[in-house]
A protein has these predicted regions:
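Active-site phosphate-binding strand-loop segment of PLP-dependent enzymes
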Residues: 1-89, 99-102
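Conserved catalytic core of Hanks-type protein kinase domains
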Residues: 2, 96, 178
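PLP-dependent aminotransferase class I/II
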Residues: 9-13, 18-26, 35-37, 64, ...
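A broad detector of short, well-ordered amphipathic alpha-helices
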Residues: 72-75, 91, 155, 166
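Short glycine- and hydrophobic/aromatic-rich loop-to-beta-strand nucleating segment
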Residues: 78-79, 87-88, 93-96, 144, ...
Length: 230
């Protein structure tokens, strides 16, 4: 019922690091009835011929879905590398391209990379080399490229991410053990037959409380220097 001819993109969100049911979502956009309803309004949409699935995987870097890392199940997946995420570059993100044929993902990547640096055909490092002064501006881009220092921070964390992820899992399971038998607690999913979380956030829910009671609980927890958010 939520899909109409105006629907161009579905954006599933991996809340707290637990992957969505991507097999069902991808099957939905391929259903003949849904594809027949799709009304393209651009050449790219016409070429795809169906609704695009772009996963908000900001929380789920390192999660697993059917034995594969998150980011590999949808047309496009976007990770966050913000300061509070499992892997950080202080600020920034990463985009995974899995567009189907006839799209060329390498070509799409090159276009996206070009756009992040004002559509300049050479980056600052390349321009500093002998003969590198000759370059062009080939379009209307943006200045959103990641600085080398930020990228270096991210690369260092990627190299030790398996260790970081194991520690997050340890903490998550400790919370789970503490709350599992509490009748008032709704604990978050972590691992099923086909999914495993990135253990980004322990999203605990408490049954039958008001907003005021929730806020009071958060204030009490904060007194113990434990960060809590809604």
């Amino acid at each position: 019922r939520a899909v109409t001819p105006r629907t161009k993109t579905i954006i599933p969100v991996d809340i707290a690091g637990f992957p969505c049911d991507y097999k069902s979502i991808m099957a939905l956009v391929e259903e003949p009835e849904i594809k027949a309803m799709f009304a393209a309004t651009s050449d790219v949409q016409q070429q795809l011929g169906r609704i695009l699935v772009l996963s908000d995987s900001a929380h789920s870097i390192g999660a697993h879905y059917e034995g594969r890392r998150s980011g590999s199940e949808t047309d496009i997946a976007v990770f966050s590398l913000h300061a509070v995420k499992n892997i950080t570059t202080a600020e920034g993100g990463a985009i995974c391209l899995n567009m189907p044929a006839p799209f060329d993902n390498d070509e799409l990547y090159a276009k996206m990379r070009l756009t992040t640096l004002n559509c300049q055909t050479k980056d600052a490092f390349t321009k500093s080399k002998a003969g590198g002064w000759r370059y062009d501006i080939v379009g209307q881009g943006m200045k959103v490229n990641m600085a080398d220092v930020n990228a270096a921070i991210g690369l260092a964390q990627i190299r030790q991410y398996d260790k970081l992820l194991a520690e997050r899992k340890r903490v998550f399971l400790a919370y789970d053990k503490a709350f599992r038998n509490c009748s008032w607690a709704v604990t978050p999913p972590a691992c099923t037959a086909d999914k495993e979380s990135s253990y980004h956030i322990y999203a605990l829910r408490i049954k039958d409380i008001t907003e005021e009671q929730r806020d009071a609980i958060i204030q009490e927890i904060s007194k113990h220097e434990v960060a809590v958010n809604v």
